[in-house]
Amino acid sequence: VKENIKGSFLGGDTRASGYGYYTWQADPEQTVSGAISEDKAWETYYHSILICNITLDNIGDISGSKAEKEDLKAEAYALRAYCYFMLVNLYGQPYNQATAETDLGVPVNDVVGMEDRKFVRESVAEIYRQIESDLKEAITCFKASNLTKTCFRWNLPATYLLASRVSLYKKEYDKAIEYATYVIAAQPQLYDLSAMSDDDYFLNEKNPEILFTYGYYLVSYYAWLAKCNFPISDDLQALYGDNDWRLTHFFYKRRAVYTAQKSETSGTTGIYGYAFRTAEAYLNRAEAYAGKGDKDKALQDLKTIREKRLKVYEEVQAVTKEDVIRRVREERRRELSFEFHRWFDLRRWDRPRIEHTFTPDIKQPDVVEKYVLEKDDPAF
């Protein structure tokens, strides 16, 4: 299993800006010059957690109907759960039931103001308990409010989707299936890519599978503004093949290479940002079925997706449990590429060996440095 991008210096090399991430440095914010840039993810997620804490602490003092207050509480709990989920998977160890109680996760911020206090890292298990508690509260509050929501606000189906993802990461397959099934029952339709115009972005207002959308679609500064430096990898491109609409609808071909383009990078009317999608619910459920050894149900969920993605439908060939698991992982890679899933999936699956090459000086293209992330490396 490989990753989804490869290095290139077509159009000038800006990979030096993302040097720390691209070359597996101990401090990923390190630039090629040795300077340390700011870690925006840590700041952004913990700031959001603080706002959620303040909201929940003051919910009794705000005006509004009981239903509106329950809905606001639900949104705060759901957002806080998502922030902790991202933080623990960015900075903590991958979830492993055997070691989760001692593996280091991230701090829990339970304050609503300034305190002279040193926060300590909680265990991975404790962070997942925090996430699950918040999701349970969010689901309860959303059901109590029963308000009609748009895809621009946290809502009940999106919360169930996150719950299915969390359960899948923990290999609690029955729960993952239960939560994913709720999502599919609430919003089963997938975007038929055969009807998608070449002028459209995939994440647009006509896409019926978007449960919740937020922000702008920044694959990353490096992968967007420097597309030619981060085209999709050869093996990812081969995984789609010419029969798959996703190759041309998820990516843009330039100078003989494909780059990610599921959405726009700015606020364009009718074009959405990051999204929670029904397709993930089918994939979460398929992976859970595969993990339980329920081959037929896993393949049925893959079929549902592939019927809307292939020009001519092809059956998935799988005989053993291992075959089914491999096919589910391949489909997940195709469908969810460049949507904040791949790195987390590599961490929780098999943590493979990954090799990157870096060209320090584009005027000397034959001078290449090689950087390797070994299998099961602690850097995962």
Predicted features by range, described:
Residues 1-72, 84-126, 146-152, 160, ...:
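Short acidic-aromatic linear motifs embedded in glycine-rich loops, typified by GG[WY][YF]DAGD(H)
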Residues 48-55, 83, 134, 162, ...:
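Amphipathic, well-ordered alpha-helical segments in soluble domains
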Residues 158-170:
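Hydrophobic/aromatic-rich effector regions of fungal transcription factors
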